């Protein structure tokens, strides 16, 4: 093998114990096939990939339980040991005794993740030839998966992330009446959206919309049936208020209506809602569940042997050079020793305690992919911790400390917490954020108390154990590994396991003690989301039923009015009802009271629209009064003239037209004869006629004067 070999197709795994003088190291080179995005680096001890290291001086043999390879990364690390394929049991005598071998080791760096350098020692002092295990801590694993997700952003969503959701959706479909189905559909849609699979995201969001539309249709049908029955049995006398109505006044209805008209669901699902802080009893129970999950995760890896950590050593340099993260086997023994009442293996405990969980719908929102197979019911945790002051005992001096800081948590547990806190673009953070959001709603859906109690401790480690997960990840520019920086940070506390005991106790106290302000803030957020959810449902119901109810009320009032009026009066009559009794108002009327407080028409004007003045302080006795009816009548103006007057006027007009015509004709002819030819036949005839008529006129005037004088 030389430097030109592709790093991703020939991955070499080795223990980092090759540069110690006086040690006899046996190396076995194993080629692992290149796999996909999933980091499957846990190796079974009985397979061909088992890595064995032997120490000739000490006579101990250890089995590597987990390597630190990320199969998607091909960056060379700064480790100084490399495998030799043609030599076994070759003594490593230091730089001076065997320089060619060391030089060859330096030429062939193993292909590792750059973040895996934090878990490997740079060198060990002479004389202390103890094989150091390479363990992948939570930070490096989470970072590797984040980089892999960034590189393979166009890949389809991971099946393990959506498989629990699909199983829950199938369970909800089997029930046929579950209210949690739209929540699961929304979570699947958001998961696909974060994975940039927009087609499937649109399909699931459309399914959620169809569910809510059918829900609104069903609610509208129920409301119509209730309104019909209410109108049929509406009493004519005022009924006394029932006991259920005494505790819910108008202000409560107004507050509910305000919430229902101002919510923004499901836009709030994008927010990262803080989990509800449990009580001290549940916090101690959360610690027991976390330790139990660590045991189950380590047992699921199928390691045949458990590696014990070395006890206290006279030389303090050894603990300073030792990586801050211990091997998985060390973690397993430590957690079992710290809590002896917990079962040793999680497989048996999981099969025994699984029937105690009555509802598995909350598992999706409260667990990650790494802890999905090792989850136990709340009964196991309650058996492990029976009082509120029960916390896991700190590790003894025979084992390394586990909880000295957030980075020392078991690998699978730390990976789950790291992915929850970083909020990368994978499918898992979307599920967890939606889990927090849907948990508040499912409380309103009256889920069993046991499942709600089980879901609370699952969200706790985000705020306590992952407070500083990425601060030690930055390596120095001169090539120093993270183990030396961890030694400088912890100081003398990392020298002996006895010193780690105090650190364990302090860490547990910090995780159990939470600020009351954070608890109140989280409770306020959860209550606000619950109110928004109820508000959205009520608002849609009101909008659907408002039009139908108003139309029916108008028809009923108009029909009552038309029965009392004649056909002519009914065509011009409108009505205005007095406000009805408040005790018989429906939700629509209450909502209208909030939107339109009061509508008073101007004096002297009559509105042609139906008005409803609902005053809050109206007395129930007003319903007994007959509603006043205001009638508006229109009459046509009688402006027709009598027949006699019309005939007389026509005659006068005709006479006037005749006189005007005579004058025009006579005057025109006279003007023509005066200015024109007098000897023309027309003028001659006109002169004869004028003489004749003028003579007759003079005779008539003379006779008239004679009769006037005589009278």
Swiss-Prot record:
Residues 1-157, 294-332, 370-389, 394-432, 457-496 are annotated as: Disordered. Residues 63-77, 478-487 have a biased composition (Polar residues). The chain crosses the membrane at residues 651-671. Residues 109-120 have a biased composition (Basic residues). InterPro entries: Consortin, Consortin_C, Consortin_N. Residues 672-711 are extracellular. One of its GO terms (biological process) is positive regulation of Golgi to plasma membrane protein transport. It is a single-pass membrane protein. Residues 1-650 are cytoplasmic. The keyword Transport does not apply. Residues 396-407, 457-471 have a biased composition (Basic and acidic residues). Signal peptide: none annotated. Its main location: membrane. GO terms for molecular function: connexin binding; phosphatase binding. GO terms for cellular component: plasma membrane; protein-containing complex; trans-Golgi network; transport vesicle. Keywords: Cell membrane, Cytoplasmic vesicle, Golgi apparatus, Membrane, Transmembrane, Transmembrane helix. Pfam families: Consortin_C, Consortin_N. It is found in: Cell membrane; Golgi apparatus, trans-Golgi network membrane; Cytoplasmic vesicle, Secretory vesicle. Interacts with connexins GJA1/CX43, GJB1/CX32, GJB2/CX26, GJB3/CX31, GJB6/CX30 and GJC1/CX45. Also interacts with GGA1 and GGA2. Does not interact with PANX1. Required for targeting of connexins to the plasma membrane. Belongs to the CNST family. This is Consortin. The lineage of its organism: Eukaryota, Metazoa, Chordata, Craniata, Vertebrata.
């Amino acid at each position: 093998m030389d430097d030109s070999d592709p790093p991703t197709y020939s991955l070499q795994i080795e223990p980092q114990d090759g540069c110690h003088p006086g040690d006899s190291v046996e190396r076995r080179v194993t080629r692992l096939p290149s796999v996909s995005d999933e980091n499957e680096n846990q190796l079974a001890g009985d397979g061909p990939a088992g890595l064995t290291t032997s120490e000739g001086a000490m006579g101990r043999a250890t089995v590597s339980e987990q390597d630190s390879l990320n199969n998607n990364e091909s960056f060379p690390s700064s480790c100084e040991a490399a495998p030799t394929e043609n030599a076994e049991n070759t003594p490593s005598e230091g730089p001076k005794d065997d320089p060619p071998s060391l030089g060859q080791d330096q030429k062939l760096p193993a292909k590792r993740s750059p973040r895996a350098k934090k878990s490997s020692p740079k060198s060990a002092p002479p004389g202390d030839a103890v094989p150091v295990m390479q363990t992948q801590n939570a930070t490096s694993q989470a970072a590797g998966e984040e980089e892999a997700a960034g590189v393979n952003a166009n890949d389809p969503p991971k099946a393990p992330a959506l498989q629990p959701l699909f199983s829950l959706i199938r369970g909800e479909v089997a029930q046929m009446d579950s209210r949690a189905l739209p929540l699961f559909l929304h979570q699947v849609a958001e998961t696909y959206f974060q994975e940039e699979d927009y087609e499937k995201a649109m399909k699931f969001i459309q399914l959620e919309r169809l569910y809510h539309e059918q829900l609104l249709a069903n609610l509208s049908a129920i409301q119509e049936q209730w309104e019909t029955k209410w109108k049929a049995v509406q009493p004519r006398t005022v009924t006394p208020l029932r006991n259920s109505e005494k505790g819910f006044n108008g202000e409560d209805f107004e507050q509910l209506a305000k919430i229902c008209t101002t919510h923004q669901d499901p836009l709030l699902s994008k927010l990262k809602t803080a989990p509800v802080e449990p009580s001290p009893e549940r916090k101690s129970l959360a610690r027991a569940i976390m330790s139990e999950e660590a045991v189950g995760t380590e047992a699921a890896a199928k390691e045949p042997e458990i590696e014990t950590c070395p006890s206290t050593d006279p030389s303090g340099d050894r603990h300073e050079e030792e990586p801050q993260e211990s091997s998985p086997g060390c973690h397993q023994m430590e957690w079992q020793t710290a809590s002896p009442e917990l079962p040793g293996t999680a497989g048996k405990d999981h099969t025994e305690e699984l029937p105690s969980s009555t509802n598995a719908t909350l598992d999706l929102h409260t667990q990650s992919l790494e802890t999905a197979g090792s989850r136990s019911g709340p009964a196991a945790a309650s058996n492990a911790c029976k009082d509120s002051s029960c916390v896991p005992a700190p590790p003894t001096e025979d084992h390394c400390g586990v909880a000295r800081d957030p980075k020392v948590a078991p690998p699978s547990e730390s990976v789950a917490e790291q992915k929850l806190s970083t909020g990368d673009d994978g499918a898992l953070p979307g599920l967890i954020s939606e889990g927090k959001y849907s948990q508040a709603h499912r409380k309103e859906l009256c889920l069993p108390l046991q499942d709600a109690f089980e879901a609370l401790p699952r969200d706790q480690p985000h705020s306590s154990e992952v407070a500083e997960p990425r601060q030690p990840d930055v390596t120095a520019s001169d090539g120093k590994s993270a183990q030396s920086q961890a030694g400088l940070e912890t100081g003398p506390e990392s020298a002996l396991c006895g010193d780690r005991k105090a650190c364990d106790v302090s860490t547990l106290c910090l995780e159990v003690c939470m600020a009351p302000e954070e608890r109140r803030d989280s409770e306020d957020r959860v209550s606000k989301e619950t109110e928004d959810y109820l508000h959205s449902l009520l608002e849609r119901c009101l909008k659907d039923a408002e039009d139908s109810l108003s139309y029916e009320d108008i028809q009923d009032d108009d029909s009552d009015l038309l029965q009392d009026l004649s056909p002519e009066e009914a065509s011009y009559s409108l009505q205005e009802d007095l406000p009805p009794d408040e005790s018989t108002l429906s939700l629509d009327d209450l909502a209208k009271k909030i939107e339109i407080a009061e509508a008073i028409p101007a004096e002297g004007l009559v509105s042609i629209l139906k008005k409803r003045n609902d005053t809050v302080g109206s007395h129930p006795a007003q319903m007994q009064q007959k509603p006043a009816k205001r009638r508006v009548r229109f009459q046509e103006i009688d402006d027709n003239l009598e027949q006699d007057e019309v005939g007389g006027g026509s005659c006068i007009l005709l006479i006037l037209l005749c006189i005007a015509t005579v004058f025009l004709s006579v005057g025109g002819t006279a003007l023509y004869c005066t200015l024109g030819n007098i000897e023309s036949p027309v003028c001659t005839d006109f002169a004869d006629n004028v003489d004749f008529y003028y003579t007759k006129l003079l005779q008539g005037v003379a006779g008239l004067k004679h009769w006037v004088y005589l009278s």
